[in-house]
């Protein structure tokens, strides 16, 4: 059977008291550690550091008459006293104490810098017949956010003889409503900034929170600094410009938040380089032979003398046709056909090639249709190695329409044309060039004076 005396013993009572004390301490600790710049829900709010006694220095010290004998020949101070507050503060009150009767006239001014401009805070004019003023003068800053007084220097102008003993200045650090604590005696005073602000007076946003320009907090709106909305892949980091919010973008990336590719670039799958420059259609002539050197008649006959052609918009526009075709078969024909008018210029015989046009990337004036049709090649061009076509192979055919021919419907492949072994990767760039041509990009780009050739 349990002993009830043990349950209600003094030791049990002591444990309950200990628990109550611990709970009280936790409550006080939570209140002490609560942030005045945030409400209980974690939302930012306007906050100010506490009022403190500020320390000033006398730039033009006057005599302490209370420490001098009463019969001193000059026991009073007459002139101007300037106080350096060692920082920018919001003034709440200024107290002047005199050990003799105060001066009949007194002017209190404040300024941001030692040279002014000075703003009068309080003025007491001299009255006729009045020999002096009170021994203690206190100036209080008027309430309201629009009448706050921010000063780094104070100036006291004494309009008569008086013995000034002490000057008491009270105020709070100028934290622009973004801090509730401040090291007022530091030089310069430093606010413990909140709302993602930084600087001695919380006068700017952190580099990572510059989505909107910095603004001072008000009781109606705390104006916290918002994080930069930089794209995690397109931007070089999380920092943005304090004025515009522009993020620092990677090469080829543009936009306020670096979220899309710029002109001339296309999206890639690489997180390190998300936008890559759109490549020009590059075609290789590794399998296109040069002219035969054994036959003297072939020397300098062919136009093809290099191994690569870089197809850009200008060279594309200078072509009469750009085709993707497959060579099917060939048969020899005589020059007595309908193309006999050309036989004198390029040779006595022709080769007729049966080709299958798979795609038309640039259409000539006389349209070339997809499907099976004939292409005509001069025999001399084939024998000199200007064109080497293999049955069953796919080629990219580029060239200009033959001049002085009797049938414009025929597709002519001569020494000025290019027959390049087809590469599937060329289709995308060529389609983009075709879209630009349809949009009018080729207007004004006249064909060259001579037939298109490879890049030197």
Swiss-Prot record:
It is found in: Secreted. Pfam families: EGF_laminin, NTR. Expressed in the olfactory bulb, the cerebral cortex, the hippocampus, and the cerebellum in the adult brain (at protein level). Strongly expressed in the subventricular zone,rostral migrate stream, and the subgranular zone of the dentate gyrus in the hippocampus. Disulfide bonds join 173-182, 175-191, 193-202, 205-225, 228-240, 230-247, 249-258, 261-275, 298-384, 302-386, 317-442. Residues 1-34 form the signal peptide. GO terms for cellular component: basement membrane; extracellular region. GO terms for biological process: animal organ morphogenesis; dendrite development; motor neuron axon guidance; neurogenesis; tissue development. PANTHER family: NETRIN-5, NETRIN/LAMININ-RELATED. This is Netrin-5. It comes from Rattus norvegicus. The lineage of its organism: Eukaryota, Metazoa, Chordata, Craniata, Vertebrata.
């Amino acid at each position: 059977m349990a002993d009830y005396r043990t349950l209600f013993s003094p030791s049990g009572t002591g444990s309950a008291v200990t628990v109550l004390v611990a709970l009280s301490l936790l409550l006080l600790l939570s209140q002490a550690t609560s942030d005045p710049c945030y409400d209980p829900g974690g939302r930012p709010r306007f906050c100010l550091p506490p009022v403190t006694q500020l320390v000033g220095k006398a730039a033009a010290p006057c005599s302490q008459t209370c420490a001098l004998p009463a019969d001193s020949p000059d026991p009073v101070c007459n002139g101007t006293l300037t106080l350096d507050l060692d920082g920018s503060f919001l003034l709440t009150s200024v107290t002047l104490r005199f050990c003799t009767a105060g001066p009949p006239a007194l002017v209190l001014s404040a300024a941001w810098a030692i040279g002014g401009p000075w703003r009068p805070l309080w003025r007491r004019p001299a009255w006729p017949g009045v020999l002096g003023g009170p021994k203690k003068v206190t100036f209080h800053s008027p309430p309201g956010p629009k009448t706050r007084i921010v000063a780094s220097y104070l100036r006291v102008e004494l309009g008569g003889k008086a013995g000034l003993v002490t000057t008491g200045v009270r105020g709070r650090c100028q934290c622009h409503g973004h801090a509730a604590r401040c090291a007022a005696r530091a030089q310069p005073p430093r606010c413990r900034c909140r709302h993602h602000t930084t600087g001695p007076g919380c006068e700017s946003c952190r580099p990572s929170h510059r989505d909107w320009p910095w603004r001072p907090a008000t009781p109606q709106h705390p104006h916290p600094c918002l994080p930069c909305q930089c794209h995690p892949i397109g931007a070089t980091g999380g920092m943005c410009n304090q004025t515009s919010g522009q993020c620092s973008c990677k090469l080829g990336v543009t936009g306020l938040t670096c979220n899309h590719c710029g002109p001339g670039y296309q999206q890639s799958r690489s997180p390190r380089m998300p936008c890559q420059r759109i490549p020009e259609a590059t075609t290789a002539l590794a399998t296109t032979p040069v002219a035969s050197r054994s036959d003297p008649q072939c020397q300098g006959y062919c136009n093809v003398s290099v191994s690569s052609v870089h197809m850009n918009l200008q060279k594309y526009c200078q072509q009469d046709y750009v085709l993707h075709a497959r060579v099917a078969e060939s048969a020899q024909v005589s020059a007595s056909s309908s193309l006999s008018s050309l036989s004198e210029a390029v040779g006595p015989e022709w080769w007729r090639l049966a080709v299958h046009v798979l795609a038309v990337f640039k259409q000539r004036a006389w349209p070339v249709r997809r499907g099976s049709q004939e292409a005509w090649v001069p025999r001399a061009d084939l024998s000199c190695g200007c064109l080497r076509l293999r049955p069953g192979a796919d080629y990219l055919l580029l060239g200009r329409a033959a001049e002085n021919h009797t049938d414009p419907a025929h597709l002519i492949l001569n020494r000025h044309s290019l027959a390049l072994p087809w590469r599937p990767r060329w289709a995308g760039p060529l389609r983009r060039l075709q879209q630009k041509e349809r949009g009018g990009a080729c207007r004004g780009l006249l064909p060259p004076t001579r037939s298109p050739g490879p890049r030197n």
